[in-house]
Amino acid sequence: MLNRQAKFERKTSETDILVEVFLDGNGKYQVATGVGFFDHMLCLFAKHGALDLTVKAAGDTHIDDHHTVEDVGITLGQSIKQALGDKQGIVRYGHALVPMDESLILVALDMSGRGHLELDLPLPAAKVGNFDTELVEEFFRALALNCGMTLHVRMLSGRNTHHIIEGAFKALGRALRQAVSKDQRLTGIPSTKGVL
């Protein structure tokens, strides 16, 4: 098996982001974005995705957290895409149904090469601590488009905003872990087109 890891940097006038990902890791993480709740969610994603993740970000959080959260999504998506290489032998599809107390979240994804997000995640509160919850959608969209994954995130039940978001990040990690896993029975690209 090839060493499925990647390092990506993104520097703009608004943010300076470094992401390193190792798809065949064991859930180790080192995350510092300057956005506390977001850091917590990225750590959960790495742990439940069993991927090793480093994220270092500096951004214009004195304005708000939008640029940092979105740009981390962009850079993480590019890192995962690069780490996957030509996608030979991967399972390709992944899904997870994750309970978090009263909330129940479904994530399904396809490493299709076609970035797309379908989000049905009504969040009761506009903020969790200092975190603007509308940024969850911005992160998922940036990740999906830059990774080239079709991503569906759906809340089946839930009342507590923290629980709903946490369930979504855990489910994303578990679904991605499944999708990027190697299937020993497959020798090529998991598509009749021969390319993803």
Swiss-Prot record:
Catalytic activity: D-erythro-1-(imidazol-4-yl)glycerol 3-phosphate = 3-(imidazol-4-yl)-2-oxopropyl phosphate + H2O
Key words of the record: Amino-acid biosynthesis, Cytoplasm, Histidine biosynthesis, Lyase
Recorded GO MF terms: imidazoleglycerol-phosphate dehydratase activity
Location within or outside the cell: Cytoplasm
SUPFAM superfamilies per the UniProt record, alphabetical: Ribosomal protein S5 domain 2-like
PROSITE patterns: IGP_DEHYDRATASE_1, IGP_DEHYDRATASE_2
Coiled-coil stretches noted in the UniProt entry, renumbered to this chain: none
Highest taxon, organism lineage: Bacteria
GO CC annotations on file: cytoplasm
BP GO annotations: L-histidine biosynthetic process
UniProt main location, coarse: cytoplasm
Pathway(s) it belongs to: Amino-acid biosynthesis; L-histidine biosynthesis; L-histidine from 5-phospho-alpha-D-ribose 1-diphosphate: step 6/9
Membrane-spanning ranges: none
Keyword Lyase: yes
EC number: 4.2.1.19
NCBIfam families reported in the protein's UniProt record: PRK00951.1-2 (NF002107), PRK00951.1-5 (NF002109), PRK00951.2-1 (NF002111), PRK00951.2-4 (NF002114)
Family note: Belongs to the imidazoleglycerol-phosphate dehydratase family.
Protein name: Imidazoleglycerol-phosphate dehydratase
